C-alpha cells in the first residue's frame, strides 16, 4: 500500500517547486531540508532555494530558450517563477532577483502552506518504496545520501566543478570610472561597467593565471572537469590571451556617453576599451553588486588583490568571495523515465540539477513535472509527460531514457544541459532566419501547452487548492 503523504528531499528550487505542486493538488507533503543542521560549502543561509551562484534566471524574452522555459513555467503557476517575478531586479533583458527576498519568500510561503510539513534533518537513506518520494537534493547532495543513491542505482554519479562569483558593496566602487549601460542599450541601463585598457587587461590576466588557488578536495586545475557554461574566470584566462574578451569581459555593445560620439568611427576606435567587467545588481537599491562571469577558485586574499586591479574597483569591499564546489549529478538517461520516475522504482522521482539539467528555471521545470506526477501517482491516475515541442518536454526527454544515444552507448559522456532550442523538434516548415525560427518555436510550444494544460487540469478537477504566495 502506498503512503499518501509524499516526501520531497531537498528544499532547493526543484524541491520547493515539487512540494508546491503536490500540496496545491491536495496531497500532504513532507519537505525535508538538512540545512542549517548540515550545510554545504556553497550555502550561506538556512533559507529554501538559496541561489548559490548567479542571481539570474537568464533571458526574459520568450523567443530565447531560457525565456521560453520561464514562460512555460508561468503557464503552470510555477512557485519559483512567480516568486522570481515578484522579487526581480533590473538586469537588462534578463530575469534577475534579489536573492535574499526571493529565498525568504519561498521559505515563508511553503512553511505557511496547510498541506506542507517542514522537517529539518539530514536524510541519510532513500525512504521505503511504499513512500512516494521526490529526490531533489541538488548538486551538493550529502556524501552519505550520495553513497546510498549509488548503491540503489548501481551506477557511479557524474560530477563537475562549479563556482560562484564574488559580491561587492555598491558604495565601494569608483563611479568616476564605472558607468551605467546595458549592452546595445537594450532596456534600462541595468549594469555597471568597468572599462579596461589593453595594458591593464594583460596585467590583470597575468595576475589571474598566476593567482594562488584555494585547496579543494579532488580538484586539480590541470585535469578538473568543468561545466563549460560556468567556467572559473582564471580557467577562461588560461585558455588564451584574448579568451576573456570574447566571454564575460567583452566590450562590444557597451558605450559611455562621456566618450563622445559612438557613431564617429575614428572616435569609437580610439575610445572603446579593450575589455569591460560588468556588475549586476543583487538588490533593487544596488547596495550589493555581483561580478558577472567571475566564478573563481582563487584564495580569498588573492581575489581581493587581483580583482582590485580592475579600474573602478581599486577600493572594492567584498560582501562574499567567490567559491568553488564539486557538483554531483546522476547519469539520468540510464536511470529515469520521461515521467522522472526511476526505472527501478516507480514511487521514486528525481528532479532538478541532480538529474543533469542546468540553470535555475530548468531545475524548477524538473520540480514541476516531478511534483505533478507524484500527485497523480498518489491519486492513482495516469502520469504525464510534457509535449516534445515544449522546452520542458525536450529537457525532460534529454535527461531520460528517451535520450537513446546517452542511455544505450557507453562511449558518450552525459553532461548537464541548459534550455536550448537545439533540443526541440524541427519545425514542419523550416525557417532560415534565426529570430523568426525561435519565434515560431515559442508560438508552437505555448500552443501545444495550452492543449496539454486543459487535459492536465481535467485530471486534477476539484482537487486543486488556491494558495497565495507570500
From Swiss-Prot:
UniProt KW keywords: Cytoplasm, FAD, Flavoprotein, Methyltransferase, NAD, NADP, Transferase, tRNA processing
Cofactor(s) essential for the protein: FAD
Family: Belongs to the MnmG family. TrmFO subfamily.
Enzyme class name: transferase
InterPro entries from the UniProt entry: FAD/NAD-bd_sf (IPR036188), MnmG-rel (IPR002218), MnmG-rel_CS (IPR020595), MnmG_N (IPR040131), TrmFO (IPR004417)
UniProt-recorded name of the protein: Methylenetetrahydrofolate--tRNA-(uracil-5-)-methyltransferase TrmFO
Binding-site residues, FAD: 10-15
Principal subcellular localisation of the protein: cytoplasm
GO biological-process terms attached to the record: tRNA methylation; tRNA wobble uridine modification
Record's function text: Catalyzes the folate-dependent formation of 5-methyl-uridine at position 54 (M-5-U54) in all tRNAs.
The reaction(s) this protein catalyses: uridine(54) in tRNA + (6R)-5,10-methylene-5,6,7,8-tetrahydrofolate + NADH + H(+) = 5-methyluridine(54) in tRNA + (6S)-5,6,7,8-tetrahydrofolate + NAD(+); uridine(54) in tRNA + (6R)-5,10-methylene-5,6,7,8-tetrahydrofolate + NADPH + H(+) = 5-methyluridine(54) in tRNA + (6S)-5,6,7,8-tetrahydrofolate + NADP(+)
One example GO MF annotation: flavin adenine dinucleotide binding
Membrane-spanning segments: none
Origin: domain of life: Bacteria
Annotated gene: trmFO
Record organism: Prochlorococcus marinus subsp. pastoris (strain CCMP1986 / NIES-2087 / MED4)
Gene3D superfamilies on file: FAD/NAD(P)-binding domain
Cellular localization per UniProt: Cytoplasm
SUPFAM superfamilies listed in its UniProt record: FAD/NAD(P)-binding domain
EC number: 2.1.1.74
Annotated PROSITE patterns: GIDA_2
Entry GO terms, CC: cytosol
Amino acid at each position: 500500500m502506498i503512503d499518501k503523504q509524499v516526501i520531497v528531499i531537498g528544499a532547493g528550487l526543484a524541491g520547493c517547486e515539487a512540494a508546491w505542486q503536490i500540496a496545491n493538488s491536495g496531497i500532504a507533503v513532507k519537505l525535508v531540508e538538512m540545512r542549517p543542521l548540515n550545510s554545504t560549502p556553497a550555502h550561506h543561509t538556512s533559507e529554501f532555494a538559496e541561489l548559490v551562484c548567479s542571481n539570474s534566471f537568464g533571458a526574459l524574452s520568450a523567443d530565447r530558450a531560457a525565456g521560453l522555459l520561464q514562460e512555460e513555467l508561468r503557464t503552470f503557476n510555477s512557485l519559483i517563477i512567480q516568486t522570481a517575478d515578484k522579487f526581480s531586479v533590473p538586469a537588462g533583458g534578463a530575469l534577475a532577483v534579489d536573492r535574499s527576498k526571493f529565498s525568504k519568500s519561498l521559505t515563508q510561503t511553503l512553511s505557511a502552506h496547510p498541506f506542507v510539513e517542514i522537517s529539518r534533518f539530514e536524510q541519510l537513506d532513500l525512504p521505503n518504496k511504499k513512500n512516494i518520494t521526490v529526490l531533489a537534493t541538488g548538486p551538493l547532495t550529502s556524501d552519505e545520501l550520495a553513497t546510498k543513491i549509488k548503491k540503489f542505482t548501481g551506477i557511479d554519479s557524474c560530477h563537475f566543478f562549479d563556482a560562484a562569483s564574488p559580491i561587492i558593496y555598491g558604495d565601494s566602487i569608483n563611479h568616476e570610472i564605472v558607468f551605467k549601460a546595458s549592452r546595445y542599450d537594450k532596456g534600462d541601463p541595468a549594469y555597471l561597467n568597468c572599462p579596461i585598457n589593453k595594458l591593464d587587461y594583460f596585467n590583470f590576466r597575468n595576475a589571474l593565471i598566476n593567482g594562488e588557488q584555494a585547496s579543494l578536495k579532488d580538484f586539480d586545475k590541470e585535469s578538473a572537469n568543468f561545466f563549460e557554461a560556468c567556467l572559473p574566470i582564471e580557467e577562461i584566462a588560461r585558455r588564451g590571451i584574448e579568451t576573456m574578451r570574447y566571454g564575460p569581459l567583452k566590450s562590444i555593445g557597451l558605450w559611455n556617453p562621456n566618450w563622445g560620439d559612438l557613431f564617429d568611427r575614428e572616435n569609437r576606435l580610439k575610445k572603446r576599451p579593450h575589455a569591460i567587467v560588468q556588475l549586476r545588481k543583487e538588490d533593487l537599491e544596488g547596495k550589493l553588486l555581483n561580478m558577472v562571469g567571475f566564478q573563481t577558485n582563487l584564495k580569498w586574499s588573492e581575489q581581493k588583490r587581483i580583482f582590485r586591479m580592475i579600474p573602478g574597483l581599486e577600493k572594492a569591499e567584498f560582501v562574499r568571495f567567490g567559491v568553488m564546489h564539486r557538483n554531483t549529478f546522476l547519469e539520468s538517461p540510464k536511470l529515469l523515465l520521461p515521467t522522472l520516475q526511476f526505472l527501478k522504482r516507480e514511487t521514486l522521482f528525481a528532479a532538478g540539477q541532480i538529474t543533469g539539467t542546468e540553470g535555475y528555471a530548468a531545475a524548477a521545470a524538473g520540480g514541476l513535472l516531478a511534483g505533478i506526477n507524484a500527485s497523480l501517482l498518489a491519486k492513482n491516475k495516469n502520469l504525464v509527460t510534457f509535449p516534445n515541442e515544449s522546452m520542458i518536454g525536450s529537457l525532460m526527454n534529454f535527461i531520460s531514457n528517451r535520450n537513446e544515444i546517452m542511455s544505450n552507448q557507453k562511449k558518450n559522456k552525459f553532461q548537464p544541459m541548459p534550455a536550448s532550442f537545439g533540443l526541440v523538434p524541427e519545425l514542419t516548415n523550416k525557417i532560415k532566419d534565426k529570430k523568426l525560427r525561435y519565434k515560431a518555436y515559442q508560438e508552437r510550444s505555448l500552443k501545444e501547452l495550452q492543449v496539454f494544460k486543459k487535459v492536465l487540469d481535467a485530471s486534477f478537477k476539484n482537487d486543486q487548492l488556491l494558495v497565495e504566495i507570500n
